[in-house]
Design a protein with these regions (language model features):
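Proteins enriched for Cys/Gly/acidic motifs involved in redox and nucleic-acid/cofactor modification
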Residues: 3-6, 10-233, 241-243
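S-adenosylmethionine
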Residues: 236
Length: 247
């Protein structure tokens, strides 16, 4: 069943943003992408498939190998080709590994390093407003555009609300939870410590809180993940153990 939502706006930056995400690389990236999606939904934006037309394409990149670098570039270029007027956002480890070179890539409009992912909504909206500061011009030059999004009833109960997307997440019974980030080993062959920074562990009370939130959404299986998971707790010199979570 199709629901038709009529959206009229005076300026492009005032309307609901349709944002498409693509995640490359590790499960930590997957977790962080989910967190970013939630932030945009809370801000009232609408998440669409990467294969759909979107206002913003956000690629959470990887740099662990040369192949990962190439894949990251390919996906960013594909997004730009899909919609040349869209805002193309690159974040993730590939951005941190080659930012100076990345900035010469005309396919990408905004680069967000890993340590700025928490501010992703603010950064993207600022770039969006700057990118489309001029009023939308229709073919006849009128600065008012009316468009119809055709969205299936299963996809949303309210455009941009995010409630139904959360409900879709609740239908899944497995989720990833990042409890550790970074690495202090600096192996000669590995770039990860340089793009993910030093070892940090999420405090156990925070882990427990997130686990409870996931359980409340119907998640039955949680996979703990990290960049160097076996080093969890070493950074606070307490060597905290996941056994503390038992019970």
């Amino acid at each position: 069943m199709e629901q038709h939502f009529y959206i009229k706006w005076m300026r492009k930056e005032e309307r609901i943003m349709r944002i498409a995400f693509l995640t490359l690389g590790c499960k930590v990236n997957s977790y962080e992408t989910d967190k970013m999606k939630n932030k945009f939904m809370e801000a009232g934006d609408y998440i669409v498939s990467f294969e759909e037309e979107a206002d913003i394409y956000l690629v959470n990149t990887c740099t662990v190998t040369n192949i990962a670098d190439r894949k990251s570039r390919q996906m960013l270029h594909r997004a730009k080709k899909k919609n040349p007027q869209a805002l193309i956002v690159a974040t993730g480890c590939y951005v941190d590994s080659a930012l100076a070179k990345d900035e010469q890539d005309e396919s990408v409009d905004l680069f967000v390093p890993n340590d700025q992912k928490n501010a992703i909504v603010t950064l993207v909206k600022q770039a969006w407003q700057q990118n489309v500061a001029d009023a939308v011009q229709s073919e006849n030059g009128v600065s008012i555009e009316e468009k119809v999004w055709q969205i299936s009833g299963e996809e949303t109960g309210r455009v941009g609300g995010g409630e139904s997307l959360m409900a879709q997440e609740e239908e899944h019974t497995r989720a990833y939870l990042t409890v550790q980030n970074g690495c202090n080993l600096y192996c000669s062959y590995c770039i990860i410590p340089y793009v993910r920074g030093p070892l940090t562990s999420k405090p156990i009370p925070q882990v427990v809180q997130e686990l409870k939130q996931m359980a409340a959404k119907g998640i039955r299986e949680v996979v703990l993940t990290g960049i160097h998971l076996s080093s969890y707790g070493v950074d606070d010199r307490k060597a905290s153990s996941f056994l503390e979570l038992k019970g």
